[in-house]
Amino acid sequence: MGQKVHPTGIRLGIVKKHTSTWYAGKAEYADKLNQDLQVRKYIQNALAHASVSRIDIERPANTARVTIHTARPGIVIGKKGEDVEKLRTELTKQMGVPVHINIEEIRKPDLDAALAAQSVAQQLERRVMFRRAMKRTVQNAMRQGAEGVKVQVGGRLGGAEIARSEWYREGRVPLHTLRADIDYATAEASTTYGIIGVKVWIFKGEIIGGIEEVEANQKKKGSK
């Protein structure tokens, strides 16, 4: 059987950027990496209902900058910014340096693989039929302008005795094309029969200019 490489990992430095940006010597590298994992875990748990897709961490000179990409910025910020201030205080305590939090709104949540995977998982937990959940997610993404979408679920589907995996795809998802902008994410649905895994691939088109084009587009978004 053909083994599949992680679609994001193989594209790092080509059309994908790292989610952690900092430099550390040998002595503190492991500590900082572990700290990043703990911070991400804490934010995901604290903002479980805020549709958080991605968390970027930067560490410029004795400070830290955390960017939270979410479809519901109002929930993250809270009344008069109370919730985001609480979060900043807690992260400062965890990281041991002053933390600045940026919140980026996701304009099209249907085109975000992480949010799409979370959506399928939530539907499965509400006992929606898995085929209907997959089809709905794929069609929503295609309607928003995706060039191709694939959703796969695996586990005791429909309460079956034997676990299996099923998938549904529309459009094309070229995993071997390195310049293809493929958003990939996974999620888990906790059902009465056990855990059901969800994988989502969303193909948004090809990036001809490489990582430079990605960075230029991000700067344009930031200046708006």
Curated annotation (Swiss-Prot):
Domain KH type-2 as annotated: residue spans: 39-107
Record Pfam families: KH_2, Ribosomal_S3_C
Keywords attached to this entry: Ribonucleoprotein, Ribosomal protein, RNA-binding, rRNA-binding
May I have one GO cellular component term? cytosolic small ribosomal subunit
Please tell me whether the keyword RNA-binding is annotated for this protein.
yes
| Record bears the keyword RNA-binding | yes
Q: Which GO terms describe its molecular function?
A: mRNA binding; rRNA binding; structural constituent of ribosome
* Gene Ontology terms: biological process: translation
The record's CDD domains line, in alphabetical order, gives: KH-II_30S_S3 (cd02412)
Identify the InterPro entries for this entry.
KH_dom, KH_dom-like_a/b, KH_dom_type_2, KH_sf_prok-type, Ribosomal_S3_C_sf, Ribosomal_uS3_bac-typ, Ribosomal_uS3_C, Ribosomal_uS3_CS
**Subunit comment:** Part of the 30S ribosomal subunit. Forms a tight complex with proteins S10 and S14.
**So what family is this one in?**
Belongs to the universal ribosomal protein uS3 family.
* NCBIfam families reported in the protein's UniProt record: rpsC_bact (TIGR01009)
Tell me the HAMAP family matching this sequence: Ribosomal_uS3_B
Q: What does this protein do?
A: Binds the lower part of the 30S subunit head. Binds mRNA in the 70S ribosome, positioning it for translation.
In Swiss-Prot or TrEMBL terms, this protein is called Small ribosomal subunit protein uS3
What's the name of its gene?
rpsC
